[in-house]
């Protein structure tokens, strides 16, 4: 397919995958929860398009979770897009995506986020997406498992991709005002149109940019990138379900619950201040309830809180909210072992 002439069939193929991904994820999550079910609400956008939002509340595992599909189009692009891709100015646009955020009740099960999307505006098109994990009481083995499954998905297309997408995730899901990562990362990519360098982010001196420069000019076809989105999207359930199976019966006290709610506050801060998807949705008159379904049902803030030294909570704030080389840094096991947080 020519970079300058994406066909209408492209939209059909992507929509079929994204709606199927929503179906598969919802089915898998309902199976593991055992009690909660997703309630669907279809919606239409007055300016063009619509979607279907699915939310689970008060399940056995999930306190709240949402899996949304949207397909929207319009005449004029919002500033959040034009700032990144000014060549799209003046073109009608089309955007579709499936996004998900899950907030488990048990503090030992991480919050998780996924989003895969496709965009067209005249001759301009791109894929974006990724998945990231946000633990509260982290385990090194869980973190490594999540990363391993997503690395294998990237490697199935090309083994060089993960070297760019892993640090890009660390870079994107970073709370600049807190100087900490939102979680332990995963993968992230955006503005992938098959041309130029893989990294198209905003930090020319970051690790992702450096890795991308080392690869040089990198050509990927539309089908390559579509296959990447499919491989990564289908990697989600195998990356997350085993963590639930291992942690959902762990007991917890008010201390763990309060710390979970406190750390959920960081999730709220990122999504409302930094997340480009939230900003794009609000700037294009998207469905507010669907856009903000990523927020947890409960969260708390505490002025000046610091985790006690050498505590289980400090393991999160001192180690797991900083970008790490999860497989090659041997010191991580030494840091986790005193807290019984390796396995």
UniProtKB/Swiss-Prot annotation:
Start and end residues of each stretch annotated as Important for dimerization: 267-302
Annotated a divalent metal cation binding sites: 103, 113, 147, 177
Enzyme active site: 113
InterPro entries, A to Z: Coprogen_oxidase_aer, Coprogen_oxidase_aer_sf, Coprogen_oxidase_CS
Cofactors: a divalent metal cation
Keywords, ordered alphabetically: Chlorophyll biosynthesis, Cytoplasm, Heme biosynthesis, Metal-binding, Oxidoreductase, Porphyrin biosynthesis
Cellular compartment(s): Cytoplasm
One Pfam assignment: Coprogen_oxidas
A single Gene Ontology CC term: cytoplasm
Gene3D superfamilies reported for this sequence: Coproporphyrinogen III oxidase, aerobic (3.40.1500.10)
Entry EC no(s): 1.3.3.3
Residues at the site labelled Important for dimerization: 177
Functional summary from the UniProt entry: Involved in the heme and chlorophyll biosynthesis. Catalyzes the aerobic oxidative decarboxylation of propionate groups of rings A and B of coproporphyrinogen-III to yield the vinyl groups in protoporphyrinogen-IX.
NCBIfam families named in the record: PRK05330.1
Protein name: Oxygen-dependent coproporphyrinogen-III oxidase
Organism: Prochlorococcus marinus (strain SARG / CCMP1375 / SS120)
Gene this chain is encoded by: hemF
């Amino acid at each position: 397919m020519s970079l300058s002439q994406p066909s209408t069939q492209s939209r059909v193929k992507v929509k079929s995958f994204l709606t199927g991904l929503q179906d598969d994820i919802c089915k898998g999550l309902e199976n593991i929860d055992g009690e909660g079910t997703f309630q669907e609400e279809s919606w239409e956008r007055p300016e063009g398009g619509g979607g279907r939002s699915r939310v689970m509340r008060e399940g056995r595992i999930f306190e709240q979770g949402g899996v949304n599909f949207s397909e929207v189009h319009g005449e004029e692009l919002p500033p959040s897009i034009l700032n990144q891709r000014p060549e799209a100015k003046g073109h009608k646009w089309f955007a579709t995506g499936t996004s998900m955020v899950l907030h488990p009740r048990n503090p030992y099960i991480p919050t998780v986020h996924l989003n895969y999307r496709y965009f067209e505006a005249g001759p301009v098109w791109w894929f974006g997406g990724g998945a990231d994990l946000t633990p509260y009481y982290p385990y090194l083995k869980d973190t490594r498992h999540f990363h391993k499954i997503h690395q294998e998905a990237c490697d199935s297309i090309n083994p060089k991709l993960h070297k760019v997408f892993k640090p890009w995730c660390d870079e994107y899901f970073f709370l600049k005002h807190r100087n900490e990562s939102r979680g332990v990362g995963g993968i992230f990519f955006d503005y992938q149109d098959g041309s130029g360098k893989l990294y198209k982010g905003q930090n020319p001196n970051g690790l992702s940019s450096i890795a991308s420069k080392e690869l040089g000019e990198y050509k990927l076809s539309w089908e390559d990138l579509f296959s990447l989105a499919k491989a990564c999207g289908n990697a989600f359930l195998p990356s997350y379900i085993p963590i639930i199976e291992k942690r959902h019966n762990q007991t917890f006290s008010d201390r763990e619950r309060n710390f979970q709610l406190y750390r959920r506050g960081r999730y709220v801060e990122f999504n409302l201040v930094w997340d480009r998807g939230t900003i794009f949705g609000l700037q294009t008159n998207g469905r507010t309830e669907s856009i903000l379904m990523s927020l947890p049902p409960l969260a708390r803030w505490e002025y000046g809180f610091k985790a006690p030294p050498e505590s289980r909570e400090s393991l999160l704030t001192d180690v797991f909210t900083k970008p790490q080389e999860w497989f090659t840094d041997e010191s991580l096991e030494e840091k986790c072992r005193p807290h019984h947080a390796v396995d």
